[in-house]
């Protein structure tokens, strides 16, 4: 999930959009590793613990692109769920929306903790990331339930880690055996 959210943020920034990626997997922050950030104490948990903190001072520029910024998770708090349930998260996302074209939130996996469902209230769109040949089929039932019950806004699914060499269709370019039926390759 951090791979997908990071690449989405980078792609949008390369299109000239001002993007911030927010590390909201505050129990197991991963953005510091992805973006090689040195200051692991600065982050959104500081703001959520004390909304008087200047949120924009916690946002760090990226060395990848001038349009890409990172708001890491920060120090792991003793009460992550409580912090995410507070109105401070709503206020933080509003501030970020006023300052950036896109706010991408990297969250904890669903099912492990309730954090992601709490964060869902401030998202305009939710992306459930599955890994090919790894995600259990039962989780797809959970995705359907989340969509039907509208627990996450505009729920989409991304499947990554697809080994195209193992797939029967869609790997090779061309018309294959179907081309002959339409006259392709005839002179």
Regions found by a protein language model. Name each.
Residues 1-187:
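P-loop NTP-binding module
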């Amino acid at each position: 999930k951090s791979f997908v959210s990071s690449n989405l943020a980078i792609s949008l920034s390369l299109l000239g959009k001002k993007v911030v990626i927010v590390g909201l997997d505050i129990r197991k922050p991963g953005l510091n590793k992805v973006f090689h950030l040195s200051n692991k104490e600065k982050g959104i948990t500081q703001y959520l613990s004390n909304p008087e903190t200047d949120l924009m001072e916690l946002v760090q520029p990226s060395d990848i692109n001038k349009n890409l910024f990172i708001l890491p998770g920060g120090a792991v708090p003793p009460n992550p769920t409580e912090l995410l349930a507070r109105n401070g998260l709503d206020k933080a996302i509003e501030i970020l929306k006023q300052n950036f074209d896109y706010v991408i939130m990297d969250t904890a996996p669903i099912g492990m903790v309730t954090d992601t469902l709490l964060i869902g209230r401030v998202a305009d769109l939710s992306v459930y990331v599955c890994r090919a040949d790894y995600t259990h089929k039962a989780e797809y039932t959970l995705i359907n339930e989340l969509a039907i019950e509208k627990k996450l806004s505009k729920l989409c699914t991304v499947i990554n880690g697809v080994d195209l060499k193992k797939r029967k269709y869609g790997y090779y370019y061309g018309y294959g055996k179907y081309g002959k039926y339409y006259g392709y390759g005839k002179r």
